[in-house]
Structures are given as C-alpha cells and as structure tokens.
Amino acid sequence: MEVNQKWNWDTKPILVKCGGFSSQLAKNVTEKVDGDPLWGSRFDATNPEAVIQTHLDFLRNGADIILTNTYQSSVEGFVKYLGVTRERGVELIQKSVQLAKQAKEQYLSEIGSEAESALPLIMGSIGPYGAYLHDGSEYTGNYADKMSKEELRAWHKTRIEICLAAGVDGLALETLPCLMEAEAVTELVLDNFPDAKFWVSLQCMDEKHMASGENFAEAALSLWRLVQSRKAENRLLGIGLNCVNPLFVTPLLSSLTKVAGSDRIPLVVYSNRGEIYDVEQGDWTGTGEEVVKFVPEWIQLGVRIVGGCCRVYPTDVLAIRKYVDGLNIKP
C-alpha cells in the first residue's frame, strides 16, 4: 500500500487537509453529533449518504486530503453502543473507508479528472483510546497511567489493519494526548505495517504542553527520532498538532524547530477554531478564530499539511486553499 506515485512533494509541496468532519456532518444530519459516544462514527451505519455528502463538502472546497469517519470508531465501541456483532463492527470500519472512496470517485467525476488520480488522498483517521472511553480523556491522556504500551498497541492494531486492508492511502494517527500512546501507535505502524504512510499529530493544552502536561517539543522530537531509528522518513508525512487552539500553534512549532536543530522535521497542523469543548454539556463554548489568518506563519515554520479540526468548515478550507494557491510555490 503506497501513496499513488502520480503525486509527490515535488509536484505539490503543501497539501490542504479537510476541516472538522463531525462539525460539518452535524449540518448534514438532523440528530445531534457532539456528545454521542460514537460521535460521527454512528452515521456510517445510520446515514451513509450524509457521510459521503460531508466528504464532498470539503472536496468541492479544495481539500487535497480527506479523513475517513473513523476517529471514534472501534469494534468494541460499535458492539457497546450500536449493539452489533464484532463482525458487523469490522464491516462498519471497512464501510467508512468505502464511503470516503465513493466521495472521491464522485468528486473526480464532477471535475472531469481520471479515476486513478492520486489526489485527493484518503487518510484513515486513527483517534486515541480516550475517544473510545467517551469521558473526555483524549484531552488529558490520564488512561496512560492505567495501561501498558502493549495494551494500547493491541487496541489500535485492529482498526489500523482494517483501514489499511480497505485501501486508505495512509494513516492519520491523531489527537494523541500523551507520549506513551503516541509512541505505542507509531511503533505499531513502523514495525507491523512496513508500507504504510502516516502522520502523527498530538493534542496540546497550551503553548508548551501536550494534553497530558508533557513537553510538546520533546515529545515530537522523540517521535522523529523513533522514525529515524527505523529509517522510515520516506513513510512519514508529518509530525505535528491537531485539535488545538490556533493561538498555541506557532509557539508550539517554534519550540520544536528550536530543539530539532538542523533537522527539518516535516510538519502537519490542523487546529480548531479556539473554542473550548465542555465535556459536561457535550458542546463548544466561547468564540473562535479564522484559522486562515494563522496559516502564513505556520507555512513559514515548515508546515506542509495544513487544514482544520473541530468547528473548521468547508468555507474555512476554501480560504486556506486560496491562500496556499496564491503562494504559487514552484516545485
């Protein structure tokens, strides 16, 4: 499994990722999405047309990358919250990949592009164990104190295997709140899936620290060293941040480039708007930022995949698309 060879960094050095899938999905369904124990994943089963429509909303606004609707998907979660069999749980994760593929196929047909086009890429969304727990712990990582790396690897392996077998272009290991889980899932991909392309994205609570309180720059650098130790730099699409306040991103990335020295670590960023998620209410509070206004400084720092996370909509992605296109970066 490789990213289609018709695309490479030389031909398109900055890629625009979609925005917040479940945020946009909420506009395409009548039921409440935030606060659901399966979040958007439920709709792969109950409203696949809305899932395809949500992918298309981002593709039609310039996204080079879409993520499967699997952030909060797990076989265990589907068994627990949908009351289905394990076999059906596996099928629903496979279906999520197929829905993304259907959206890509429809979009390419709309723009008159060949069906085998490399872009847009479809990345398998691999969210943290805390998302399955449905208790807000993906914003603390406190479960790392109660679990071993081996347990976390075993839990992540099933979904990764299913996504890769279903034909994603790569894996988005995302919203990881603590270094132990980030290392566990990165090691799993490096050692068990030798052809898989991937990025690793950490969740941070301020300008210096991951959700767990660990230093972001040190954690990200240790992940980079891990990739280097396996000589897997060519498989890494980026290391970075997501589901984070955009105001924190530049200080966080600057701290990483400082400790990285002469190493040029490929960077990925897709922030929220800056509102706060209230776990008790299952909703967002506060006012947000226009993500596009931060993009110039992020690109200056070496970001090569940029987009949005929660509450970042297709109109925001279009604004990012227009800015990136306006740079007119020559290969």
Curated annotation (Swiss-Prot):
Ranges for domain Hcy-binding: 3-324
Reported phenotype of the disruption mutant: RNAi-mediated tissue specific knockdown in glial cells, motor neurons, muscle cells or the midgut results in reduced adult lifespan. RNAi-mediated knockdown in neuronal tissues or in the midgut results in sex-dependent kinetic pathologies with males suffering reduced locomotor functions while females are unaffected or show increased locomotor function. RNAi-mediated tissue specific knockdown in eye imaginal discs results in progressive loss of eye cilia from 10 days of age onwards.
UniProt keyword terms in alphabetical order: Metal-binding, Methyltransferase, Transferase, Zinc
Keyword Membrane: no
Reactions catalysed, as given in the entry: L-homocysteine + glycine betaine = N,N-dimethylglycine + L-methionine
Alphabetical list of Pfam families matching this protein: S-methyl_trans
GO terms under biological process: methionine biosynthetic process; methylation; S-methylmethionine cycle
Domain of life of the source: Eukaryota
InterPro entries on file: Betaine-hCys_S-MeTrfase_BHMT (IPR017226), HCY_dom (IPR003726), HCY_dom_sf (IPR036589), Hcy_S-methyltransferase (IPR051486)
NCBIfam families xref list: PRK09485.1
UniProt family annotation: Belongs to the Betaine-homocysteine S-methyltransferase, BHMT family.
Function: Involved in the regulation of homocysteine metabolism. Converts betaine and homocysteine to dimethylglycine and methionine, respectively.
Protein's recorded name: Betaine-homocysteine S-methyltransferase
Gene designation: Bhmt
